[in-house]
Amino acid sequence: MTLKQLVTGCYTILRSIWMIGMQAFNKRETQMYPDIPIYQTSRFRGRIVLTCDPDGYERCVACNLCAVACPVDCISLQKTESKEGRWYPEFFRINFSRCIFCGLCEEACPTTAIQLTPDFEMAEFKRQDLVYEKEDLLIRGPGKYPEYNFYRMAGIACNDKLKGHAENETRPINVKDLLP
């Protein structure tokens, strides 16, 4: 080993120690995430939830628009009807391992049942645990739109009257009778 190599080696070691020492007193760039919560904007799109209307019923009418709008096909549901004639999903399933949190399902929902929340901590050890059922997604509250009730805005079906028998309503036309 020559004297030049010895001096160069000592210089590089001292330079490294000096750089580490100078960085020790600088402001930290790393955010201490679990201790200090991360700031999120008001438009942040996180975990998907299903909300209820002000009367306490679930808002989802199983129209399937959210599943059609989803670009990665992570939403699946099946429609059923209650005794009162109200539609609701028999099952509602979201596979969060495929979801890209784009928000298209929230925009497509006519009843504001699907809403994206600021929650983003959904880490799991098994991929099967990222498939959420309706019971996991349903929250007891109206979410972002507390006063909106789809059935009050769209109207309620009358069970005792047929189509066209209510006031100011014309009877439906059978289009097959119009054909030659």
From Swiss-Prot:
Residues involved in [4Fe-4S] cluster 2 binding: C70, C99, C102, C105
Domain 4Fe-4S ferredoxin-type: 46-80, 90-119
Enzyme class: translocase
Chief place where the protein resides: membrane
Membrane topology value: Peripheral membrane protein
Subcellular location(s) per record: Cell membrane
Pfam families xref list: Fer4_7 (PF12838)
Purpose of the protein: NDH-1 shuttles electrons from NADH, via FMN and iron-sulfur (Fe-S) centers, to quinones in the respiratory chain. The immediate electron acceptor for the enzyme in this species is believed to be ubiquinone. Couples the redox reaction to proton translocation (for every two electrons transferred, four hydrogen ions are translocated across the cytoplasmic membrane), and thus conserves the redox energy in a proton gradient.
Protein name: NADH-quinone oxidoreductase subunit I
Lineage: Bacteria, Pseudomonadati, Pseudomonadota, Gammaproteobacteria, Candidatus Palibaumannia
Gene for this chain: nuoI
